[in-house]
UniProtKB/Swiss-Prot annotation:
SUPFAM superfamilies: HSP20-like chaperones (SSF49764). Involved in spore germination. The gene is gerT. This is Spore germination protein GerT. Keywords: Germination.
């Protein structure tokens, strides 16, 4: 009888091969792959993260920028000194806030917003050492009907 198993290289991925796999090893492998594809601060790019995860990214620890949203607005709070405020320039696209000369001169910080925002109507107020940027959400009510074929 011919030994077919010798020519079947995928046996390592069979159910028996995965029975002894440690879930933590699998999770570490996935984190390693995600970091290699999306970069070290990849976790902030995804809206649904594990709240019980003990691993915090370097961006979360060093980033004092606070982002939250309401039904009609997106708010970004940035702690600043008056000296930083004089050098600061802020711009935005429909999904990203770009802060120039922050946290130090010559650097640029990009903040991904949790939802799309309008081009006009953005306001920025500096009070008590905090710059608060308020965006109007872009409400997209465009519906498209999809034909079902069968």
């Amino acid at each position: 009888m011919f030994d077919w198993q010798r020519f079947f290289p995928f046996q390592q991925f069979s159910k028996d091969g995965l029975k002894n796999a440690d879930p933590k090893d699998v999770e570490q492998y996935i984190h390693h792959m995600m970091k290699s594809v999306f970069g070290p601060g990849y976790a902030v790019q995804f809206p649904f993260r594990d709240p019980l995860s003990k691993e915090t990214s370097a961006a979360d620890e060093s980033d004092p920028i606070d982002i939250f949203e309401t039904t009609s607005h997106v708010f970004v709070k940035i702690p600043l000194t008056k000296e930083q405020l004089n050098l600061l320039k802020i711009k935005h696209t429909s999904q990203t806030l770009i802060i120039e000369n922050y946290p130090e001169k010559g650097r640029q910080e990009k903040v991904v917003l949790p939802s799309l925002v309008r081009r006009k109507g953005t306001k920025a107020i500096f009070k008590d050492g905090i710059l608060e940027v308020m965006f109007l959400k872009n409400e997209d009510f465009n519906l498209s009907e999809i034909d079902i074929t069968f």
